[in-house]
């Protein structure tokens, strides 16, 4: 066995897709060869060779190196099922035309009929043919693997280009100019994209010391490309080298590069051999908010801005160049000249935007369409402002309500600024800067920036209570409004990110300290919409959607399905209490009485559901005849007030633990008392007793959900 190398040499690949293309290319070829028995899958990974294959991807190549590939797959002995015997043989046992046709397709003739086996496959008697299937040669198997890999590449867009013959067209992500296929030091004769495989590749476009590079064997690929081609072909190795150079260059200046994994990945896909250089710009540009400058340098120029020890932007940045000239001044100077107009534009936008107040921009939002059924952004901020005022009022703080209403009115005003028009990623951030420039309070300024939070999993919540209220109002308005017009997520499609908005609402209510009932919030939110819709249907749909997200979130936090179902079955409206309820349920489940009480609770619930009698609100002591029902009534009279008092105080664990005293009387009741007594009065009274028991047991959670 020898190692295998396959490389496809192309024009510059799309940088954001490069990593996925490289991994897919290698993965498809490797697994296709495994399927064809041309590779033995390793039973154990060798510490010195931790993977049986390695992928390479640089701007102009994708490649795969595979260990221990055989020249030919072994032949296989197969007992191939042909067809039911009733179809293949006539009444006299002779072969039918259908059987002869099948045999001919497999390369056998009529003489093979006598050698057929008969077996029962569980449905009918079938005919089997013992045959030898020839194993594929490496050339055959690799051709198949390469064709499949190319067809399945995750290519964002394909282009059509003409081959050198002048009339053949090929569809691929970029024009391909070379194909390498080496098994050890032997070329594997395969073709793809109009190319014939060989052992020659190209190095760096400008800095290779040899062109072409004649590869000695499959194992020398990376080494020869680095030494003779000035290329680091491994994506990870190139990324690590860039990270090392960034840290080293920043360290010499006693600064640190901004951390951005996405930018690092993109730059890795843009260069073949990195060379990090230091550039700088005029100090005057630092008067512009650093978020603007950072975004300009990252998004447009792929530079790494440098920060000081306090995290403040400096006027220096790092350039990841694809060339290493003896005198880098021309490269650095060119990059500095290119970035200067970008920064000047940002400075101009910032200065122009500050000439108008945020409030003066609000009328402009009426020209920004939000949704054709829900109006403009101007109409939307009016609704969000009203919801924010209602939330602040519900919290009992009119000053807070007024601040939240004002912040909500201004929250979207930066959407019509020049800076946000150029860089939509800065919405909210620029609103905060402009609010501070106008002299508005930090509470309002930070609320404008933070009302988008949390934007993603793990994101921070708004920094102050005003921000919490505006963020909550914004997300409630989005969710309720879109549900009211039937724009619900379906399957994996969620174009308006409503799942993310629901998670944001949950996090603000559970972590943000806003103790407000969810149903009240939803009712108030829906009340601000003027269009016609079914209010009750929308309310129920939004509430169910939020509770579904809550259920998944709680399970992700480590609570069991039974614990979550038990608590959420009660539809608790104060979401901040849910964790306490879950901990109480967990503590209750550990009690020795828990299993019996949960089972009894389930039984009680079923009895009450099936009852065709009216259930009285109160128990009549005079109708308690059996000792067991009297004992249960007495126990309830003692336990229920204790459990209720603990529940009212928010001591959910204490409330559930108080129920433990009911185990013995509940067990005795079901052992000795017939609920469906012949006397209607006794039956009704016993149902009232069970209803009281059910109510006492199901305040914190539906304990029947814990029953096995």
UniProtKB/Swiss-Prot annotation:
EC number: 6.1.1.14
Top-level EC class: ligase
Pfam family, one: tRNA_synt_2f
An MF annotation (GO) of this entry: arginine-tRNA ligase activity
InterPro entries in the record: DALR_anticod-bd (IPR008909), Gly-tRNA-synth_bsu (IPR015944), Gly-tRNA-synth_heterodimer (IPR006194)
Key words, A-Z: Aminoacyl-tRNA synthetase, ATP-binding, Cytoplasm, Ligase, Nucleotide-binding, Protein biosynthesis
Name of this chain's protein: Glycine--tRNA ligase beta subunit
Gene name as annotated: glyS
């Amino acid at each position: 066995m020898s190692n295998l190398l396959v490389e496809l040499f192309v024009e510059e690949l799309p940088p954001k897709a490069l990593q996925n293309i490289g991994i897919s290319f290698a993965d498809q070829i490797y697994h296709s060869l495994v399927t064809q028995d041309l590779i033995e899958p390793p039973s154990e990974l060798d510490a010195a060779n931790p993977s049986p294959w390695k992928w390479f991807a640089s701007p102009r190549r994708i490649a795969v190196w595979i260990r221990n590939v055989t020249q030919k797959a072994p032949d296989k002995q197969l007992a191939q099922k042909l067809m039911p015997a009733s179809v293949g043989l006539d009444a006299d046992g002779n072969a039918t035309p259908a059987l002869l046709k099948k045999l001919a397709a497999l390369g056998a003739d009529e003489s093979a009929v006598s050698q057929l086996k008969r077996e029962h496959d569980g449905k009918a008697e079938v005919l089997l043919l013992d045959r030898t299937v020839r194993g594929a040669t490496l050339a055959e198997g690799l051709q198949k693997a390469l064709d499949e890999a190319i067809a399945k590449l995750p290519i964002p867009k394909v282009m059509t280009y003409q081959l050198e013959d002048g009339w053949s067209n090929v569809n691929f992500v970029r024009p391909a100019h070379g194909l390498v296929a080496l098994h050890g030091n032997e070329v594997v004769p395969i073709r793809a994209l109009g190319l014939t495989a060989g052992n020659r590749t190209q190095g760096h476009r400008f800095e290779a010391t040899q062109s072409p590079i004649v590869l000695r064997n499959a194992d020398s690929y990376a080494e020869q490309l680095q030494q003779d081609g000035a290329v680091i072909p491994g994506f990870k190795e190139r990324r690590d080298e860039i990270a090392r150079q960034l840290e080293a260059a920043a360290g010499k200046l006693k600064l640190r590069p901004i951390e951005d994994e996405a930018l690092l990945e993109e730059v890795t896909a843009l260069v073949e051999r990195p060379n990090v250089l230091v550039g700088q710009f005029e100090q005057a540009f630092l008067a512009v908010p650093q978020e603007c400058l950072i975004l300009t340098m990252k998004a447009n120029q792929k530079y790494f801005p440098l920060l000081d020890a306090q995290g403040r932007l400096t006027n220096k940045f790092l350039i990841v160049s694809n060339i290493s000239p003896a005198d880098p001044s021309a490269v650095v100077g060119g990059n500095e000249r290119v970035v200067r107009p970008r920064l000047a534009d940002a400075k101009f936008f910032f200065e122009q935007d500050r000439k108008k107040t945020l409030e003066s921009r609000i009328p402009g939002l009426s020209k920004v369409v939000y949704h054709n059924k829900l109006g403009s952004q101007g109409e939307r901020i009016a609704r969000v402002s009203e919801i924010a005022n209602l939330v602040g009022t519900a919290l009992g703080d009119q000053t807070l309500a007024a601040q939240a209403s004002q912040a909500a009115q201004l929250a979207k005003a930066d959407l019509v600024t020049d800076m946000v028009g150029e860089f939509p990623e800065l919405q909210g951030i620029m609103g905060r800067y402009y609010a501070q420039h106008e002299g508005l309070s930090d509470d309002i300024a930070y609320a404008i920036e933070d009302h988008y939070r949390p934007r993603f999993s793990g994101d921070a919540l708004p920094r102050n209570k005003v921000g919490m209220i505006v963020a909550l109002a914004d997300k409630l308005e989005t969710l309720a409004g879109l549900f009211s017009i039937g724009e619900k997520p379906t399957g994996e499609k969620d174009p308006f990110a409503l799942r993310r908005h629901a998670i944001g609402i949950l996090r603000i209510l559970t972590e943000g300290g806003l103790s407000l009932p969810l149903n009240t919030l939803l009712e108030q939110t829906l009340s601000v919409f003027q269009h016609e819709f079914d209010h009750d249907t929308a309310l129920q749909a939004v509430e169910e959607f939020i509770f579904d997200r809550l259920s998944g979130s709680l399970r992700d936090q480590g609570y069991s399905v039974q614990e979550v179902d038990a608590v959420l079955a009660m539809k608790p409206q104060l979401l901040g209490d849910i964790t306490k309820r879950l901990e109480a349920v967990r503590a209750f489940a550990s009690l020795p009485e828990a299993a019996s009480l949960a089972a009894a609770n389930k039984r009680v619930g079923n009895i009450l559901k099936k009852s065709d009698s009216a259930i009285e609100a109160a128990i009549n002591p005079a109708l308690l005849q059996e000792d067991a029902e009297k004992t249960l009534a007495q126990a309830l009279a003692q336990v229920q007030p204790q459990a209720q008092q603990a529940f009212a105080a928010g001591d959910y664990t204490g409330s559930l633990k108080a129920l433990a005293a009911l185990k013995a009387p509940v067990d005795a009741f079901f052992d000795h008392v017939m609920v469906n007594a012949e006397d209607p009065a006794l039956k009704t009274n016993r149902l009232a007793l069970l209803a009281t028991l059910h109510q006492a047991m199901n305040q914190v959670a539906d304990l029947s959900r814990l029953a096995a």
